Amino acid sequence: MGLSKEVEDNLPTFSSDVLRLEIHGPDENHLSVIDVPGIFKTTTPGLTSKSDITLVRDMVLNYMRNPRSIILAVVPANVDIATQEIIELARELDPDGMRTLRILTKPDLVDKGAEDKIIELVEGKQESQELGWVVVKNLGQKDLQDLSISRDLEEDLFGHSPPWNRLSSDNYGIEALRTRLQALLAANVRREFPSVSAPSSICSTKSNL
């Protein structure tokens, strides 16, 4: 499927085709990271259409329905979180919350006075979630070039700046997200291993007959 380069060419802005990058090596993890577009409900004249809305939503749902998928539901902290469709879809497709990790971005853009509500959400005081929330600070391209500076910027916001410094270190920053993901991946492997190993045993038995 072709993608639009000009507003007037009438081609779709999004495609169901997948650009795949594979990294092989003895020290590489055996996993797939799938970056999908964000779900949206409103068209942009000359840029997106109703068919784009449907295509993106179907694409996202297709991956979320896979019981082996870990869902990272990313939501900006400076919007009405309760109205974000991705959160509701995650509840529907993963009602136990065992494979959904919710991530809040852009905490530095939250209106003054609204931080307490975000903190209560992350701390689980508003609703109970199995895996909860992690808050991360978005970094500029220049900041990403030096990871030590990136960590310092996060620590400056979450470790020293009220009211964000009320958050537990388990609930903010890239390191907390990395730790949560590692634990989630390990739990996912343990949960799915019986269903993966059973077919392997059957194939092995058949080949020996």
Stretches found by the model and what they are:
Residues 1-197, 201:
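Globular "head" domains of long coiled-coil molecular machines
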Residues 199-209:
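Core structural elements
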